[in-house]
């Protein structure tokens, strides 16, 4: 149970941001930190904490959280309870930059107020939040002013986003971590890019560039400067919550490719590595060396995992085999219980049902250390 000082700190941070304070449940989540051996996470009292949960990136109809959290708040509450009942202790939410910034230097106070209510919901439900920011998942919803910014101005706006979000959440133990951006990438050395968003997947732009051109700089230096800029914005108002970046493990695609943001020389201000792993049938064993290569003296969270290119059985075998290298696992939940997927006997629905059933069945095994 979080101590009285932590309860007061969370209330003060919220009140200072100008938002109403909601009472916290007695069983609300406590603070999480990196363990002393730098391989995993622990509670304040030293008990091991294994992040085990879901990406709550969209609902069953493909709508993003901000599309329905105002008119359908009861749905969000129900989904959080269902994720908890399936065994989750962490929920990863994906905040869209266009919903939290009204302009380059103007946070949206209504969105911040709703975020604080979501943190309170997590507290009441007994869940931690991984708050991933700067999303531009629906290309049509990205503000024209944001798309038009040059690199320096875009980074400044991103810093405004993170300072506002972190300011609302500072002092609240239910927040497990801040993830600066989902799958940031950089252009090639001699290949300036024409747009900030990479190709879509399933109608969504999950991958985003942090620069359109290196202009003679090293990719490593650009990545390092970006991490320092955004973590600096967070640390100006919040010195305690963990910070990470959701990284594509390029070694899964290109043999010998090395980590970028997981490299301590580049992602020095980050507290742990977060990678997205989708094992392929026949190549399951290939993921383990890549996973270990991302550790580099810090915990590695598998922040995205799903049987996209393998069976649920194969995925389960990989997850068990990765226990010595991974500090936690976050899959996906899209607003339906496992039995609801039986109503439509499509291959995709059967795969999702199998995943959710595996997740629930594996909960005791994967969260005990």
Model-derived features: positions:
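N-terminal pre-domain segments of enzymes
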Residues: 21-29
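Conserved alpha/beta catalytic core and glycan-binding cleft of carbohydrate-active enzymes
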Residues: 287-290, 305
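Aromatic- and carboxylate-lined catalytic core of secreted/periplasmic carbohydrate-active enzymes
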Residues: 333-369
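Glycan-recognition surfaces
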Residues: 268-286, 328, 354, 358-369
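Surface-exposed substrate-engagement region within the catalytic domains
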Residues: 289-300, 311-325
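Hydrophobic h-region of N-terminal signal peptides that target proteins for export
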Residues: 11-21
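Bacterial N-terminal signal peptides that target proteins for export
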Residues: 1-9
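Active-site mouth of glycoside hydrolases
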Residues: 29-270, 282, 305, 309-318, ...
């Amino acid at each position: 149970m979080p101590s009285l000082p932590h309860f007061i700190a969370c209330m003060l941070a919220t009140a200072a941001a100008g938002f109403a304070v909601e009472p916290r449940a007695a069983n609300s989540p406590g603070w999480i930190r990196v363990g002393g051996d730098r391989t995993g996470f622990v509670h304040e009292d030293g008990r091991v904490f294994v992040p085990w949960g879901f990406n709550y990136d969209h609902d069953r109809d493909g709508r993003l959280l901000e599309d329905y959290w105002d008119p359908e708040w009861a749905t969000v509450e129900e989904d959080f309870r269902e994720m908890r009942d399936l065994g989750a202790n962490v929920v990863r939410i994906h905040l869209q930059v266009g919903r939290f910034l009204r302009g380059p230097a103007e946070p949206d106070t209504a969105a911040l107020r709703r975020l604080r209510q979501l943190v309170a919901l997590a507290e009441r439900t007994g869940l931690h939040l991984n708050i991933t920011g700067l999303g531009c998942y629906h290309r049509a919803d990205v503000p024209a002013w944001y798309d038009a910014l040059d690199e320096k101005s875009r980074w400044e706006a991103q810093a405004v986003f993170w300072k506002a979000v972190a300011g609302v959440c500072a002092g609240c133990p239910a927040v497990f971590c801040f993830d600066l951006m989902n799958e940031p990438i950089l252009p090639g050395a001699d290949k300036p890019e024409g747009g900030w968003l990479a190709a879509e997947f399933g109608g969504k732009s999950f991958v985003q560039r942090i620069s359109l051109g290196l202009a003679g700089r090293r990719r490593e230096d650009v990545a390092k400067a970006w991490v320092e800029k955004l973590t600096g914005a967070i640390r100006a108002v919040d010195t305690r919550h963990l910070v990470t970046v959701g990284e594509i493990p390029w070694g899964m695609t290109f043999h010998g490719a090395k980590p970028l943001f997981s490299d301590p020389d580049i992602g020095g201000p980050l507290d742990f590595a977060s990678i997205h792993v989708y094992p392929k049938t026949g190549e399951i064993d290939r993921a383990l060396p890549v996973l270990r290569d991302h550790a580099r003296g810090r915990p590695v969270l598998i922040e995205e995992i799903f049987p996209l290119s393998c069976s649920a059985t194969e995925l389960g075998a990989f997850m068990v085999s990765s226990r010595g290298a991974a500090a936690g696992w976050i899959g996906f939940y899209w607003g339906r219980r496992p039995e609801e997927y039986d109503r439509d006997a499509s291959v995709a629905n059967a795969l999702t049902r199998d995943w959710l059933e595996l997740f629930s069945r594996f909960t005791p095994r994967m969260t005990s250390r």
